């Protein structure tokens, strides 16, 4: 081992994974000149064709890292959301989401990180971590000491598998999701609720729409992470009267079916010299549209804490856990409950749900605390203590 090569990043925060959480963390750190480097296992970055919705809480971070305006210009900016049950509109309300594709968000984050002279290493597949020595070993035979490890490597986190004693492997949630980006123009968000399924559609730009169809299926053995499907399979899970509203989906060659996976428990958000962010820390079912926003929040808050307590990683981790754990757990639990709420089968319960949605502010109550959350204020509160 050449010592100079092994030690080249010993003062750096090592970010494992160049996804949304990894790039966001990299930007937050680079803006304050904190040495960091991203290690990505793939030879290049390729985000899949799926939509992502960013509510106010996530937008506050994107504004702070100076990419929100650019994202808005090339994304959807729906102002209203409509809820439909049994092909009839129940209610609608005003929203201020940015709806886009993961690919677009990812490319803007990457561009910003590189603009800040951020360093990223491709083809660096992690195979071992010595958490006491903070030594990373990769499949390309490189071994590198680092200052701290930020695990941003998703639900199938190699970092967690290598280190965590809780061994919480991802488990099938009982839900699967059809996803596609289709050639349809739409200006609003539409939720179609039905027995054992729901569909969400929203614009990702001026000409394309994200289609997400979630359904309940208890056969976990056949549910892979992601498979290429076709229109006939989609039609067996999602009613034709909804699909007929989006005729271009019939000819779409990229219709993917995802098994929705989670963990039975959240597990640790940090251990020794490693901290978990995003899906590596807390995968959630996507039924409140908060997976991406929570990852963005994690990265902003952990990054700001690293900057504030640069020489006290234990304090950084402890405060990160205290700030994040209860919020994430609440949204995680509420997301599962939302699936049940969306997929009611009993006609009486459906009738009651629809009345509640139409004549009360239940949606506002369920979403206000989630969307109004301000990561900047969270950090400011610490500064004022």
Give the label of every model feature segment.
Residues 30-50:
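Glycine-rich FAD pyrophosphate-binding loop
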Residues 333, 337-372:
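Alpha-helical membrane-targeting segments
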Residues 14, 18-31, 39, 150-151, ...:
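Conserved mid-domain beta->alpha element of the FAD-binding
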Residues 2-13, 55-164, 168-181, 218-237, ...:
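Conserved N-terminal helical subregion
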Residues 180, 189-221, 238:
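Active-site substrate-recognition segment that forms the wall
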Residues 12, 35, 208:
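Residues at the starts of beta-strands that form the adenosine-phosphate
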Residues 170-175, 187-188, 224, 231-232, ...:
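A short coil-to-beta-strand element that immediately follows conserved catalytic motifs
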Residues 21, 44, 156:
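Conserved Rossmann-like nucleotide-cofactor binding loop
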